């Protein structure tokens, strides 16, 4: 979406992302800042400040030329120097880069087996960068699609078609590779999404079913990955609002769920 980005030049994209992040940190943490990099320059060169109600200050304006030297972004964040920053990651290089640059990470689709390798890559890179033994799971949030109903069949009936349709949209570009276990090979099909159905998704990464089933799947994530942060999404396209809210409440407010999960 950035006009400077180029799908054929990932090295450039990394530099672009890194510079953007540097600018964000400056804007949040410094009263006034300037930046001159490969892609961006702030303030814009030769920007002249002339305003009778806001006379120029030497710190931010060249008093001889009235050219703006620094800018400020308001309001500043409450957390100092700035809030924790999370990067959505998937590939090994992105995971390592995030860990080396002090960023938390967000992961989404992969299976537990595939996530374990990603979690370990982040742990190792973060441990090296911070010169300490970082626990597995620290700094990582996992997103899972969730729909809770009274029975397994009801969950599939109410939400199964919608999650499959959504994943069909997502996988249009990426195929099914991100849903596979390490070293797994799928049978050849005429079209790349022929295997995509509810059963294919459910056993890999869906929290769809009864409260008891969802609890057990979350416990598995905790036990296998030492998962510390879970984000669930229930309002995917096609789901009725009242069904979405009922699903969320059944996990958030029943005696079967949060106390049971956090007792692990």
For the regions a protein language model found, what residue spans apply to each?
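Acidic/polar active-site rim loop that often engages polyanionic ligands
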Residues: 1-7
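Conserved small/polar residues in nucleotide/adenosyl-binding loops
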Residues: 254-260
């Amino acid at each position: 979406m950035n006009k400077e980005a180029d799908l054929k030049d990932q090295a450039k994209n990394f530099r672009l992302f890194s510079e953007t992040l540097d600018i964000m940190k400056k804007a949040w943490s410094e009263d006034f800042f300037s930046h001159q990099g490969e892609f961006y320059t702030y303030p814009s060169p030769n920007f002249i400040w002339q305003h009778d109600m806001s006379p120029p200050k030497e710190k931010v304006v060249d008093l001889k030329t009235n050219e703006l030297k620094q800018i400020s972004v308001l309001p500043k964040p409450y957390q100092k120097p700035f809030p924790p920053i999370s990067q959505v990651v998937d590939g090994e290089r992105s995971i390592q880069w995030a860990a080396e640059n002090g960023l938390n990470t967000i992961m989404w689709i992969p299976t537990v087996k595939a996530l374990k390798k990603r979690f370990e890559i982040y742990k190792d890179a973060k441990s090296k960068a911070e010169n300490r033994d970082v626990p597995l799971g620290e700094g990582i949030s996992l997103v899972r699609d969730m729909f809770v109903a009274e029975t397994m069949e009801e969950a599939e009936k109410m939400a199964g078609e919608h999650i499959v349709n959504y994943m069909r949209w997502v996988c249009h570009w990426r195929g099914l590779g991100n849903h596979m276990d390490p070293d797994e090979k799928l049978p050849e099909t005429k079209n790349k999404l022929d295997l995509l159905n509810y059963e294919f998704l459910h056993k890999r990464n869906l929290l769809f079913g009864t409260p008891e089933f969802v609890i057990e799947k979350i416990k598995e994530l905790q036990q296998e990955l030492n998962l510390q942060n879970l984000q669930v999404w229930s309002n995917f396209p096609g789901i009725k609002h009242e069904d979405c809210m009922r699903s969320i409440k059944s996990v958030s407010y029943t005696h079967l769920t949060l106390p049971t999960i956090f007792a692990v």
